[in-house]
Curated annotation (Swiss-Prot):
It catalyses: 1,6-anhydro-N-acetyl-beta-muramate + ATP + H2O = N-acetyl-D-muramate 6-phosphate + ADP + H(+). HAMAP family: AnhMurNAc_kinase (MF_01270). This is Anhydro-N-acetylmuramic acid kinase. Gene3D superfamilies: 3.30.420.40. Pathway: Amino-sugar metabolism; 1,6-anhydro-N-acetylmuramate degradation; Cell wall biogenesis; peptidoglycan recycling. It is an enzyme of class 2 (transferase). InterPro entries: Anhydro_N_Ac-Mur_kinase, ATPase_NBD. The keyword ATP-binding applies. Keywords: ATP-binding, Carbohydrate metabolism, Kinase, Nucleotide-binding, Transferase. Belongs to the anhydro-N-acetylmuramic acid kinase family. Catalyzes the specific phosphorylation of 1,6-anhydro-N-acetylmuramic acid (anhMurNAc) with the simultaneous cleavage of the 1,6-anhydro ring, generating MurNAc-6-P. Is required for the utilization of anhMurNAc either imported from the medium or derived from its own cell wall murein, and thus plays a role in cell wall recycling. Transmembrane segments: none annotated. Disulfide bonds: none annotated.
Length: 367
């Protein structure tokens, strides 16, 4: 049975709430609906940055000490506003939507401690929007010993299977963290985080230029990357680990550029993201023939150029060039995952998160 599923995603980039509608049975996508976006205000973004700092001390996933309780209320309210605006703009009614997939805002991800924390009050959201809400997608995977990320690969596979091209294909999502999904003609599905995405660069731009991000990579294009710094950074043990593996937004926070000109810093961090993505190639079964880039990084032209320089003869293209809605893919994915969760279908696999067996997940909150 086809479901009308609305996905909501607030990623590690802390930019806002993405909203996207799809028609799906949890196995294939029948139709893409409209998408929307509700940006976080500077006050909300600052609150979330504080929540990330405070969350490093958490030992229980349900604890909300100090600023975390306030941040959870803000996240829930922002998502409720995002849904209300989306429904109004598209002249829909709540009853037109069968299920909402609500990721929440990750504030801590420590799979080695079997701990992952996403803030956002799903029962309160369901009451506010009058639609059933599927949430808490990662918990079952982490509790079973999985990495709890990435979760979008099953959706990437559904998208890639609609392309008539020779594999292997890698779909790269460059959000706060970068992750890849490797898809080949043998139906092999491998996924992992590869390293930083936009988070280090965004934080650097905010700190040095008071800008939220480097628009189209124009600032990085003015500088020359410090390749020696990148080589040292790539010596971190994470980069030699085989898939599956996952990261937290703050895992690279200790890397310091030192006192460098802003353009050099931006170029170095952009190149580091590209180099970290390319570093996964020797750890894959076969060398990819094509790379499809989605997420915020797909709009960074310097990032795309730097990735092309590092992947040999393979093609690198933005998802938009294929007719995919790059900014909406992660939100669409959580609508897709909500449909899969409702039907008890797997959300994660041994080769995506390292979980011992294919795992379903998600908890439903009804209005």
């Amino acid at each position: 049975m086809m479901l009308t599923a609305l996905g909501l995603m607030s990623g590690t980039s802390l930019d806002g709430v993405d909203v996207a509608l799809i028609e799906t049975d949890g196995k294939q996508v029948k139709a893409f609906g409209p998408s929307g976006y509700r940006p976080y205000s500077p006050v909300e973004r600052n609150l979330l940055r504080q929540a990330l700092s405070e969350a490093v001390h958490l030992t229980r996933r349900d604890a909300r000490p100090g600023i975390l309780a306030e941040a959870e209320r803000a996240v829930t309210q922002a998502h409720a506003e995002a849904v209300a605006a989306f429904v109004a703009q598209n002249r829909m009614r709540p009853e037109d939507i069968d299920i909402v997939g609500f990721h929440g805002q990750t504030v801590l991800h420590r799979p080695e401690k079997r701990l992952t924390v996403q803030i956002g009050d799903a029962p309160a959201l369901a009451r506010a929007i009058h639609i059933p809400v599927m949430h808490d997608f990662r918990a079952a995977d982490v509790e079973a010993g999985g990495q709890g990320a990435p979760f979008v690969p099953v959706y990437h596979r559904a998208l890639a299977q609609s392309l008539e091209r020779e594999g292997p294909i890698v779909v790269v999502n460059i959000g706060g963290v970068s992750n890849i999904t490797y898809i080949d003609g043998n139906d092999t599905l491998i996924a992992c985080d590869t390293g930083p995405g936009n988070a280090l660069l965004d934080d650097f731009m905010y700190r040095t230029m008071n800008q939220a991000f480097d628009t189209e990579g124009k600032f990085a294009a003015l500088g020359t990357a410090d390749e020696a710094w990148i080589a040292r950074a790539l010596e971190l043990p994470f980069f030699a680990l085989p898939p599956p593996k996952s990261l937290d937004r703050n895992d690279f926070a200790a890397l310091k550029l030192g006192d460098v000109p802003p353009a050099v810093g931006a170029a170095t961090l952009t190149a580091f993201t590209a180099a970290a993505i390319a570093r996964i190639i020797p750890l894959l079964p076969r060398r990819p023939r094509s790379w499809i880039v989605c997420g915020g990084g797909a709009r960074n032209l310097t990032m795309l150029r730097m990735l092309r320089e590092r992947v040999g003869s393979a093609t690198v293209e933005a998802a938009e060039a294929l007719g995919w809605a790059s900014d909406a893919i992660e939100a669409q994915a959580f609508g897709f995952l909500a449909a899969r969760g409702l039907k008890g279908l797997p959300l994660s696999y041994p080769a995506t998160t390292g979980v011992p067996m294919p795992m379903t997940g998600g908890v439903i909150a009804r209005p």
